[in-house]
Amino acid sequence: MCILILCGPQADPAQFLPVMLPECAGRALRTVVCTDVDSLIAALQAAGGDAEVELVLLDSGDLSPSAHVHAKALRAALDALPTPYIELHTDGAQELEPWLHPQHAPLAVVITPHDAPRAYAMSLGIAAHCLPSLCAPLRAAA
């Protein structure tokens, strides 16, 4: 089982990778860096068909105004996602909902101005809280 981190165009994974943990809530963290809107849509579609993915952290990056041309395909990819997702941004203008209006709304939207490591830490904290623990509970001998 894993948490998939999707980094969109202009999202710089180097700014959070040094502080990234190898896992969260007993799940491996898998990162996919997308160079454009088309690859972001393809990654969302692939995540929907991957039984290992339990939750998606979506850092859509700084999508250019031309990305709005792809709104229908991006919205369809989000709406088809069978898992919850958390949107995270370092700028409020990057939020997807105001122009995308997906039916499958994010579990949470995290916006931390100019502080990507904090956005990822908060998003992973939310993920850890929302996903059931994979660790066996400790039991006291009777």
Model-identified regions with their sequence ranges:
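Structural motif
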Residues: 6-10, 35, 59-62
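Short acidic/histidine-rich motifs immediately flanking catalytic phosphotransfer sites
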Residues: 48-58
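A short beta-strand-loop structural module common to alpha/beta enzyme folds
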Residues: 28-40
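Short, glycine-/small-residue-rich phosphate/pyrophosphate-handling segment
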Residues: 8-22, 94-142
